[in-house]
Regions:
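Hydrophobic membrane-insertion alpha-helices, especially the h-region
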Residues: 6-21
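Bacterial extracytoplasmic/cell-wall-associated proteins, especially those involved in peptidoglycan
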Residues: 21-183
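Positively charged n-region of N-terminal signal peptides that target proteins for export
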Residues: 1-5
Length: 183
């Protein structure tokens, strides 16, 4: 009797562990799929800005880290605290400081070169742009790996932010949200 109880308990525990583990997976190949070429001109422009931000902020991070960076960008769009479109958020300066450091480092002018260098069908930039399309069209149906973050930084810098609550660590990025008012 004790043995069958222990086996039953172990099976239930295993099922619970598996189900908990499965909820932690982040899907980026959501059921609503389209290609970049099928988007409207306005959506293409927004996706390009999102892809550039993912590329320059997290190109060599795990896929979940790239998705988390995309979510911070889209969380800002929907927060009411930043610009109301993706390109505006990516290019926004607050107190003459770029919100995404790559944008102030002349990289926007290099992106066309980056695209040309990576024009093969399986290039890193094209993979990231496909990811950006997927997140763009499925944002409201996806799990946010940043847990609602509006800010992040790489783990090798210390910005000294105050009034920030850490929401997640994904790859080499640490994600935060505000605890008070203002940005």
């Amino acid at each position: 009797m004790k043995l069958s109880y222990a086996i039953c308990f172990s099976v239930v525990t295993l099922i619970l562990l598996i189900s908990v583990g499965m909820t932690q997976q982040i899907r980026y190949d959501m059921p609503f799929k389209t290609t970049f070429n099928n988007l409207s001109p306005q959506a293409k422009a927004e996706v390009e800005c999102l892809a550039e931000n993912i590329y320059f902020e997290s190109a060599y991070e795990p896929k979940q880290g790239q998705i988390a960076v995309a979510f911070v960008t889209l969380n800002r769009v929907n927060s009411g605290l930043f610009e109301t479109d993706i390109c505006g958020v990516v290019k926004q300066k607050i107190k003459n400081v770029c919100q995404f450091s790559w944008y102030c480092e002349d990289k926007p002018y290099r992106i066309s070169t980056e695209k040309r260098l990576t024009s093969t069908p399986n290039s890193l930039y094209n993979d990231i742009r496909d990811l950006a399309v997927s997140v763009y069209i499925n944002y409201e149906r996806m799990i946010d790996p940043s847990n609602g973050a509006l800010f992040y930084h790489a783990d090798y810098v210390n910005p000294g932010w105050k009034n920030m609550k850490m929401t997640a660590v994904v790859g080499r990025h640490i994600f935060y949200n505000r605890t008070g008012k203002g940005i």
